[in-house]
């Protein structure tokens, strides 16, 4: 009799474990399916916004990067990529080999797009579009975004920076001096700095991880009750930052407010044909929709152990 009772208890425990595992598996499958559906929706929206490949930062390079990295079949067709590359060459030809003297961040993002379509950054119709990123003083003067994307471009494409440590230290100093991780209006600069520094999080000699953790704590305090960071773009950027650190934006406890994750926050800006940037808007916003696609794509890649800003091997 006792053996029978004991056996029944064991069976009950095993069944409970199986149900729990099955329930967890079901939740994961549902989350993965939802992410796939949302990514496909964002791809469709971006293709409507940017039907032709072009060099423009809005509706241009970001669209190309999101479409290529999304993994959605035929998201960025050969023709789309050719149109983008042709536009890059036209711009270089008309401006004596310079993409944009006043906006190095735009140049860096365009270079990422060029690399993703398999072209040589050091020979785009005879022009080297990586030269500017190696000029630390010019990059630094253009602000923290230019420094962040210089680091991203270097790590993603193999472009060697003359003194990488100077870029890293300047970025940390800039974010700390302005306390941008505590200021909602300037938080995007700190968020993108995290993306740039994510490749160096084990660099204890210059306290990268300690600073990133401090910024993450400050940014977490800026998160709103709906899970967002106050705008679609900021929410998307925060998702990309988390995934660049290998963290899951759905389950990361530091960024869950009132049961709402950053993923929930992002979807709160979704409309019938794209994304708005703020809750009061009615018309689809180009930048918000592009950044939403990039964020969703980064989440898909994070589950595969990959970053948004890296070349898949």
Which functions belong to the PLM regions below?
Residues 1-7:
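N-terminal secretory signal peptides that target proteins for export/translocation
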Residues 7-28:
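Sec-dependent N-terminal signal peptides of Gram-positive bacterial secreted proteins and lipoproteins
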Residues 2, 26-313:
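Preference for long, amphipathic alpha-helical scaffolds in soluble/luminal domains
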């Amino acid at each position: 009799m006792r053996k029978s009772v004991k056996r029944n208890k064991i069976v009950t425990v095993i069944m409970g474990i199986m149900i729990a595992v099955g329930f967890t598996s079901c939740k994961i499958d549902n989350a993965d399916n939802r992410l796939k559906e949302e990514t496909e929706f964002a791809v469709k929206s971006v293709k409507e916004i940017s039907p032709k490949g072009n060099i423009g930062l809005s509706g241009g390079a970001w669209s190309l990067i999101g479409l290529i990295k999304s993994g959605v079949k035929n998201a960025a067709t050969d023709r789309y990529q050719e149109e983008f590359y042709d536009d890059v060459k036209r711009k270089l030809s008309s401006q004596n080999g310079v993409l944009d003297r006043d906006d190095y961040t735009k140049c860096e993002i365009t270079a990422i797009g060029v690399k993703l379509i398999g072209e040589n950054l050091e020979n785009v119709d005879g022009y080297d579009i990586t030269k500017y990123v190696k000029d630390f003083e010019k990059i630094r003067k253009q602000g923290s975004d230019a420094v962040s994307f210089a680091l991203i471009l270097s790590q993603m494409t193999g472009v060697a920076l003359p003194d990488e440590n100077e870029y890293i230290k300047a970025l940390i100093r800039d974010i700390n001096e302005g306390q941008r991780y505590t200021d909602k209006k300037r938080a995007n600069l700190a968020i993108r700095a995290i993306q740039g520094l994510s490749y160096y999080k084990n660099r204890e000699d210059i306290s990268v991880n300690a600073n990133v953790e401090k910024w993450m704590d400050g940014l977490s305090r800026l998160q709103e009750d709906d899970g967002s960071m106050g705008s679609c773009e900021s929410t998307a950027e925060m998702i990309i930052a988390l995934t660049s650190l290998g963290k899951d934006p759905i389950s990361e406890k530091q960024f869950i407010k009132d049961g709402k994750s950053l993923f929930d926050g992002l979807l709160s800006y979704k409309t019938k044909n794209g994304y708005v940037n703020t809750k009061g808007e009615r018309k689809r916003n180009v930048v918000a929709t592009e950044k939403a696609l990039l964020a969703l794509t980064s989440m898909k890649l994070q589950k595969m152990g990959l970053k948004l800003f890296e070349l898949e091997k």
